[in-house]
Regions:
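Pre-active-site segment of Zn-dependent metallo-hydrolases
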Residues: 9-11, 21-136, 188-198, 381-388, ...
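Hard-cation-handling environments
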Residues: 231-372, 387
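Short secondary-structure boundary/capping segments
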Residues: 98-102, 106-110, 224-226, 261-264, ...
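Metallo-beta-lactamase
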Residues: 99-163, 293-332
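Active-site neighborhood of phospho(di)ester-bond hydrolases with catalytic His/Asp-centered motifs
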Residues: 28-30, 54-63, 70, 82-85, ...
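Core dinuclear metal-dependent hydrolase active-site scaffold
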Residues: 1-52, 133-197, 323-330, 336, ...
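Cap/insert and terminal regions of metallo-dependent hydrolase folds
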Residues: 91, 168, 189-278, 363-368, ...
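Short active-site oxyanion
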Residues: 55-56, 78-81, 243, 272-274, ...
Length: 465
């Protein structure tokens, strides 16, 4: 059995890991690289392997850094199935459709500017036709079911508690009377977060592929201090008639923000101000949430059973058309605009940043991880001048970060996950974390488990397991 790592190796984007057994290859995730345009352009077309050689894909969840390159596969001969939870199948389809539209739109915008500079045109990685081809290969599965994906090879999906439908995936391979079990954590969530159930305890395994997004840090808890911080932000917008721009994932983070704002209003801590969810994808994703209540925790289920939609209110407005989106840029505050993409690498939020970033009364609020080289990372790091659509712009808006909203397990959670596996795995591969985070987590696990073989793969590396 071989394990190869073609993405999210000492980085957090482009999750792609391949498990090879005699006569069959399984791809774990097929994510889109995000970051420097030229590098992303190359890596999203050259996947590092031959898609024709892939027998099946096992998809952990719908986020673009895990699922975003799936439509590239059928272009180059992939003809197998994509196994995915039913909620993730619905979410992934709409996210890939949105990704194709955003790529096409952004390429048109950039090409108009590049043409004037005499530079070559850029093209989308895939189009909506490619999305349709891969979506027809999705096979929805339920949590806990064991499915046979090839002779002597089975897989089961376990609730990871990260986003709706997210899963850790356990793979069993039996040969010559011996069974080897591989557990791919996917992205792990946190306990006691809104909407979703807590992550399931890990099942036993011989080999663990573990994410490390926050492998060297701990999250704040969304307690009274952070609630007061959110309350103050909304009051700031009211006082200065300003805009709060929130780049947020359309799936998971947007729905959580809606619920938390509703809680503040419902408790009488703030008066409502207009909240604009400027993302057609978020609107579609929220409908998927409503359809897949099997993923909800008890509290959210009770809210639905009381005939109260946790994702709706009179002051919450979902924006669909480009015309409505553009109108927001000419409107006066106070208002909150929640828009994707979460790392500011495309989508409507970039246009809102362009119009809001040079007003010191406005606030840009980050509520999730920002990968290296993204516009979001530059803003979080405090760059005074940032490139927006290729044009340097001076930042005067305030930058605020909420760490307590992360849907990712932190260092404590990840270490607890490893400790919960009985008996301990013989090998652990640390992925989906920037090098500093991955190496820090690896060193701590090694110190706690001296007999365990810990690896932090480089891009393109292969291991005989």
């Amino acid at each position: 059995m071989n394990l190869s790592f073609y993405g999210a190796a000492r980085s957090v984007t482009g999750s792609r890991h391949m498990l090879e057994v005699p006569g069959f290859s399984v791809l774990l995730d097929c994510g889109l690289f995000q970051g420097r345009r030229d590098e992303a352009f190359r890596r999203n077309r050259d996947l590092g392997f031959d898609p024709k050689s892939i027998g099946a894909v096992l998809l952990s969840h719908a986020h673009i850094d895990h699922a975003g390159a799936l439509p590239v596969l059928p272009r180059y001969g992939f003809s197998g199935k994509v196994y995915v939870t039913r909620a993730s199948a619905d979410l992934t389809t709409i996210m890939l459709e949105d990704s194709a539209r955003v790529q096409e739109s952004d390429c048109r915008y950039v090409n108009n500017k590049e043409r004037r500079g005499g530079r070559a045109s850029v093209h989308p990685v895939y189009d909506s036709n490619d999305v349709g081809k891969i979506a027809r290969r999705f096979e929805g599965v339920r949590y806990g079911d064991t499915l046979k994906i090839a002779p002597r090879l089975t897989a089961s999906f376990h609730d990871a508690g990260h986003i709706l439908g997210s899963a850790s995936i356990r793979i069993k391979y039996t040969a010559k009377g011996n069974t080897t079990t591989v557990l791919f954590s996917g992205d792990l969530g946190r306990a006691n977060m809104p909407i979703l159930r807590d992550p399931e305890p890990p099942p036993p395994c011989d080999i663990l592929i573990l994410e490390s997004t926050y492998g060297d840090r701990l999250h704040e808890q969304f307690g009274e201090e952070m609630t007061k911080k959110a309350q103050d932000l909304l009051e700031h917008a009211r006082l200065y008639k300003s805009k709060i721009i929130v780049p947020a994932f359309a799936v998971g983070r947007t729905q959580e923000l809606i619920m938390r704002i509703k809680e503040l209003v419902g408790e009488g801590r703030v008066d409502p101000i207009p909240i604009y969810i400027d993302s057609p994808l978020a609107l579609k994703a929220t409908e998927v949430f409503r359809r897949h209540r099997e993923c909800f925790d008890e509290e959210t289920l009770k809210t639905f059973s009381s005939d109260d939609d946790p994702f709706a209110s009179r002051y919450i407005h979902f924006i669909s058309s480009p015309e409505e989106s553009k109108r927001l840029n000419t409107m006066k505050g106070p208002m909150v605009i929640i828009s994707s993409s979460g790392m500011c690498e495309g989508g409507r939020v970039v246009h809102h940043l362009k119009h809001a970033i040079q007003d010191e009364a406005n606030v840009i609020v980050f509520v999730g991880f920002q990968a290296e080289h993204t516009l979001g990372r530059k803003l979080v790091e405090g760059w005074d001048v940032v490139p927006i659509f290729g044009v340097p712009m001076k930042r005067q808006a305030q930058i605020v970060k909420f760490n307590g909203l992360s849907a990712h397990a932190d260092r404590h959670d990840l270490l607890a996950y490893v400790r919960a596996i009985h008996p301990p795995p013989s090998s652990v591969f640390i992925v989906h974390g920037e090098e500093k985070q991955a190496l820090s987590l690896a060193a701590t696990i090694q110190a706690e488990h001296p007999g365990m073989e810990i690896s932090v793969p480089h891009m393109g590396s292969t291991y005989d397991v």
